[in-house]
UniProtKB/Swiss-Prot annotation:
Organism: Mus musculus (Mouse)
Protein name as it appears in the record: mRNA decay activator protein ZFP36
Positions of the UniProt region annotated as Necessary for mRNA decay activation: 166-319
TM helices/strands, residue ranges: none
Positions of modified residues (Phosphothreonine): T84, T250
Region Disordered, residue ranges: 65-95, 179-309
Alphabetized Pfam families for the sequence: zf-CCCH
Zinc finger (C3H1-type): 95-123, 133-161
Ranges where the record places region Necessary for nuclear localization: 87-160
Tissue: Expressed in skeletal muscle satellite cells. Strongly expressed in differentiated adipocytes compared to preadipocytes (at protein level). Expressed in embryonic stem cells (ESCs). Expressed in heart, placenta, kidney, intestine, liver, lung, thymus, fat and spleen.
Gene that encodes it: Zfp36
Subcellular location: Nucleus; Cytoplasm; Cytoplasmic granule; Cytoplasm, P-body
Keyword Repeat attributed: yes
Length: 319
C-alpha cells in the first residue's frame, strides 16, 4: 500500500468524524491541537499533569494545593548571600590573643601579621576567662609520673608558683589522704618540691570518716603527714593559735576528744572494756575510721579489773 493511499484513507476518516460532531474541520485542525480547540476542563487537567513543581521559572507560577499557603519566590543568583562576601563577620575564639606568639617572641616578627591569633607583645595580651577552679588543684599526672602531656596549658598546678587562687578565698586542695600519712594513690612517690604535707583543714576526707572541729584537734598537721611509726608530736596548749584553741588547757580536755575518735563504728555494739575496742579495731583493718592505741595518743590508763558474768557473782554470794 502506498503512502498516498494511507493519507487519503485518513483524510476520509477525518471527514466522517467531523460530520458526526456537526463540524467541518480539516485534517490540520485534528493534528494541530491547541488550547482554543480543547475545553477548559480538559486544559486544566492536562496542565496539572504536565507541570512539575521542581522546575525553574520556565514553568510559571503554579497555585498551591488547597489548605497550603503560596510558596515564596526563590531568590535569584543576585540575591543569594555569597560565603566570601566582606559583610560576613568571622567568629573569634574565646582564646583569641590570650597567649603570646612564640615566633614573635623569639624572632620579633610573625608571618601572619595582624591576622595572627596570638598576642604580639604584652599590649595585645588579653585576660582569658578561666574556670573558677583553674590552678587550684594538684595535677595527678605530674604528681605521680613527674611529667604532664599538657605542659604549661594544664589547668592544674605543677609548681607552687602556679597557684592562682585569689587571696580572699581559701586555697582548697582536693587531695585525698589516708590515715597512714601518705596519699591514697601511689604511696612510694614523694610530693613535688616546695609542697609540705597538706594540712588537715585543706584535705577532703571520705564521708565515712568525719574529722572533728578545728578547735578540738589536739594533733599537729604533721601527725598525719609523717611516715608510719614516727612518734606523734603533741600540741602545746600554751601556744594556742586561735581563741577556740585557748579554751582547752588541761590534759583531760586535750585528750577528751580522742576518746570519741578512738572508737570504731561498732563500738556501741561491744562492751565498755577498752580491750574490746582494741580487739575490734584490729579486726576492722579495712574501715575508714581511725583506731588509735591508748598508750600512743593518750596518757597511760590503768588496766581494768577482770569482769565476771552476773551469774557467777550470784553463785559466789549464795555460797
Amino acid at each position: 500500500m502506498d503512502l498516498s493511499a494511507i493519507y487519503e484513507s485518513l483524510q476520509s476518516m477525518s471527514h466522517d468524524l467531523s460530520s458526526d460532531h456537526g463540524g467541518t474541520e480539516s485534517l490540520g485542525g485534528l493534528w494541530n491541537i491547541n488550547s482554543d480547540s480543547i475545553p477548559s476542563g480538559v486544559t486544566s487537567r492536562l496542565t496539572g499533569r504536565s507541570t512539575s513543581l521542581v522546575e525553574g521559572r520556565s514553568c510559571g507560577w503554579v497555585p498551591p494545593p488547597p489548605g497550603f499557603a503560596p510558596l515564596a519566590p526563590r531568590p535569584g543568583p543576585e540575591l543569594s548571600p555569597s560565603p566570601t562576601s566582606p559583610t560576613a563577620t568571622p567568629t573569634t575564639s574565646s582564646r583569641y590573643k590570650t597567649e603570646l606568639c612564640r615566633t614573635y617572641s623569639e624572632s620579633g616578627r610573625c608571618r601572619y601579621g595582624a591576622k595572627c591569633q596570638f598576642a604580639h607583645g604584652l599590649g595585645e595580651l588579653r585576660q582569658a576567662n578561666r574556670h573558677p577552679k583553674y590552678k587550684t588543684e594538684l595535677c595527678h599526672k605530674f604528681y605521680l609520673q613527674g611529667r604532664c602531656p599538657y605542659g604549661s596549658r594544664c589547668h592544674f598546678i605543677h609548681n607552687p608558683t602556679e597557684d592562682l587562687a585569689l587571696p580572699g578565698q581559701p586555697h582548697v586542695l582536693r587531695q585525698s589522704i589516708s590515715f597512714s600519712g601518705l596519699p591514697s594513690g601511689r604511696r612510694s612517690s614523694p610530693p613535688p618540691p616546695g609542697f609540705s604535707g597538706p594540712s588537715l583543714s585543706s584535705c577532703s576526707f571520705s564521708p565515712s570518716s568525719s574529722p572533728p572541729p578545728p578547735g578540738d584537734l589536739p594533733l599537729s598537721p604533721s601527725a598525719f603527714s609523717a611516715a608510719p611509726g614516727t612518734p606523734v608530736t603533741r600540741r602545746d596548749p600554751n601556744q594556742a593559735c586561735c581563741p577556740s584553741c585557748r579554751r582547752s588547757t588541761t590534759p583531760s580536755t586535750i585528750w577528751g576528744p580522742l576518746g570519741g575518735l578512738a572508737r570504731s563504728p561498732s563500738a556501741h555494739s561491744l562492751g565498755s572494756d577498752p580491750d574490746d575496742y582494741a580487739s575490734s579495731g584490729s579486726s576492722l583493718g579495712g574501715s575508714d575510721s581511725p583506731v588509735f592505741e591508748a598508750g600512743v595518743f593518750g596518757p597511760p590508763q590503768t588496766p581494768a579489773p577482770p569482769r565476771r558474768l552476773p551469774i557467777f557473782n550470784r553463785i559466789s554470794v549464795s555460797e
